[in-house]
Amino acid sequence: MTISPPEKEQKKEPVLDKPIETDAIPVDFSKLDKPGFWSKSLAKGPKTTTWIWNLHADAHDFDTHVGDLQETSRKVFSAHFGHLAVIFIWMSAAFFHGARFSNYSGWLSDPTHVKPGAQVVWPIVGQEMLNADLGGNYHGIQITSGIFQMWRGWGITNETELMALAIGALLMAAIMLHGGIYHYHKAAPKLDWFRNLESMLNHHIAGLVGLGSIAWAGHCIHIGAPTAALMDAIDAGKPLIIDGIPIASIADMPLPHELCNPAIASQIFPGLAGRTVENFFTTNWWAFSDFLTFKGGLNPVTGSLWMTDISHHHLAFGVLAVLGGHLYRTMFGIGHSLKEILDNHAGDPILFPAPNGHKGIYEFLANSWHAQLGLNLAMIGSLSIIISHHMYAMPPYPYLSIDYPTVLGLFTHHMWIGGLFIVGAAAHAGIAMIRDYDPAVHIDNVLDRILKARDALISHLNWACMFLGFHSFGLYIHNDVMRALGRPADMFSDTGIQLQPVFAQWIQNIHNSAAGSTTLAGANVNLQPGLVSEVFNGSVSQVGGKIGIAPIPLGTADFMIHHIHAFTIHVTLLILLKGVLFARSSRLIPDKANLGFRFPCDGPGRGGTCQVSSWDHVFLGLFWMYNGLSVVIFHFSWKMQSDVWGLTGGNFAQSSITINGWLRDFLWAQSSQVLTSYGQPISMYGLMFLGAHFVWAFSLMFLFSGRGYWQELFESIIWAHNKLNLAPTIQPRALSITQGRAVGAAHFLLGGIATTWAFFHARLIGLG
């Protein structure tokens, strides 16, 4: 990609004199009437049906519109504001539904019996059947997004506050939309501003993350924690007394601004009495130990983390982020320079013997947004997967842990988001290698050495995949055969041939024994063994007669399914990594970089060169990601129902060790709710289950047949239309190979995800 304006010599002064260009691009509404205005060929309009597919494929490929990094950067930056606006509108809709159509107040008053609902179906031709009795004289659709639990954690106590949030979110959306227009048309940043990476890190880490976390800690301290303390006392039947009046119900709750009054707040947390500033600056920080705690474990009333622990966490994290954000050299000439760090960083001479170390890596990252995006997607995707585990192991929101459909939904959601982001990381890494990588800059540095060693990397990874696949699947096949032959003693199981996950059990014991041994002297902490998370040999957390979380025992069944996880993860990695390492060239197609990110084959006359583009690796990686994560969420769903929630009689350990057990005791047995949902409030999940299966099956039509079949069929259909003088002016064309695979993958994933959605929700909502 060309870089405009031309690169200048590195500036001595770190601060840019004028970082923006005013009135750079005038607003031109006429473009809205010209689909494909960015491309000469697309702007001519459609001659064949391929035009509409190319329009969709290239609409957001800003690189190809102008081929100018500054213009691309401005478009991406402006699009960020549009994205934020969409998020605020979406949040506003959630707040509005909570304020106008929900049973939020009813749920707050009895969260262990009333189920959350925020949508009432209108009775047109019988749809009112979907309005389930959720308790508290409310009929509606049960929601499983966790927003009620989250709002309770924020300290929201009535629908009026939700309506205020809905209006506020709409206003923020309007500001964001204006920001996107302003920073593209009126005050567009220059390329040097985008490439000023140290200032960007300072702004993002210290400003957005650090100050944002401290600001949220302030909300938690002054609103969230006092509200939680009052409401927890109500739910426990031991109301607190404020100014001589017992706070016995939500109607008695002080308004949020009243909680900021030290005279009221100090009756809940004495540390919030009027001397907080003095205590802070005299370092008398122990005075804050009643609302900045380190208790560990779960609140026995709500089955969630202590709000005072959460406040402490956000404050500490925010302070660390503010400090970390100031590590980089910006305007004062002190701190780290990323270019100096990378240019001077050479790895271990034995393990990583690249003579030029990381030289050239800074320039690659500073000029390739695809490379940066690849790294960021990989990290945020991994973080999402970590979050999915924390949602059940350390539930952050009140009463979340006993809302089983929501726990399962949040786990599944964050797993799929993480998987999609990681595949996206490989996609953008491949694009970066093709469009932004300059071999002349990378000579004997770490990236060059990895590319030179790619055959060894991929072949070894392929061996690991084969080893994991044959052995882990072989354990299941062995068990199926032994069970069929009536030889349980010869099966791999906790009662037969044991394969205990000794390392995982050791890690559980470390977490259990380490609690309480790493605390500060004099701190107000009460960490007991098992209270880092109850899943690590802790105790059972029960709320309202339901198990929120309990110790999760690991045995042979977990050992076996975890090696299936290892297998699917390694195969996904093999596909994605091969797509990146062989994006520019391969023995089969040495000039692959000239063909671009996505291409069907290496031209006519070269058989066997189809489906080798970097895009095709992303396509294949999506399937393995989806199938791998399906095993993960199935494992989680069955394990929790069996060993934690007590819904399936603890059958996981003995049933999940055979393929037949997964088919019979998980898929078949647990689909009874969705298959028999007709005539019940969960009947829409039955329809969704059928419909999503259809969408999934529809995808196979695109994936299993070639382009020529359809083009041949179209020729006959067009001939018939010509006979009747009904031929269309836009010539029908079969989808290209790449387009067909894209449509197939989209329907495969959509159908599979919606099928699983219906299966999980009907199961746990149906069980009540």
UniProtKB/Swiss-Prot annotation:
Positions of divinyl chlorophyll a binding: M701, Y709
**Quick one: which residues bind phylloquinone?**
W710
Q: Does the keyword Chaperone apply?
A: no
Which InterPro entries does this chain map to? PSI_PsaA, PSI_PsaA/B, PSI_PsaA/B_CS, PSI_PsaA/B_sf
Superkingdom to which the source organism belongs: Bacteria
Question: What would be one Pfam family of this protein?
Answer: PsaA_PsaB
- Catalytic activity field: reduced [plastocyanin] + hnu + oxidized [2Fe-2S]-[ferredoxin] = oxidized [plastocyanin] + reduced [2Fe-2S]-[ferredoxin]
Q: Give binding positions for divinylchlorophyll a'.
A: H693
Bilayer topology: Multi-pass membrane protein
**Looking at the UniProt record for this protein, which Gene Ontology cellular component terms does it annotate, in alphabetical order?**
photosystem I; plasma membrane-derived thylakoid membrane
Localization annotation? Cellular thylakoid membrane
Question: What S-S linkages are listed for this chain?
Answer: none
Q: Single Gene Ontology BP term?
A: photosynthesis
Q: How is the cofactor bound?
A: PSI electron transfer chain: 5 divinyl chlorophyll a, 1 divinyl chlorophyll a', 2 phylloquinones and 3 4Fe-4S clusters. PSI core antenna: 90 divinyl chlorophyll a, 22 carotenoids, 3 phospholipids and 1 galactolipid. P700 is a divinyl chlorophyll a/divinyl chlorophyll a' dimer, A0 is one or more divinyl chlorophyll a, A1 is one or both phylloquinones and FX is a shared 4Fe-4S iron-sulfur center.
The record lists [4Fe-4S] cluster as bound by: C601, C610
Has keyword Lyase? no
What molecular functions are annotated in GO for this chain?
A: 4 iron, 4 sulfur cluster binding; chlorophyll binding; electron transfer activity; magnesium ion binding; oxidoreductase activity
Q: Which NCBIfam families match?
A: psaA
What does it do? PsaA and PsaB bind P700, the primary electron donor of photosystem I (PSI), as well as the electron acceptors A0, A1 and FX. PSI is a plastocyanin/cytochrome c6-ferredoxin oxidoreductase, converting photonic excitation into a charge separation, which transfers an electron from the donor P700 chlorophyll pair to the spectroscopically characterized acceptors A0, A1, FX, FA and FB in turn. Oxidized P700 is reduced on the lumenal side of the thylakoid membrane by plastocyanin or cytochrome c6.
Protein's name in the database: Photosystem I P700 chlorophyll a apoprotein A1
Native species: Prochlorococcus marinus (strain NATL1A)
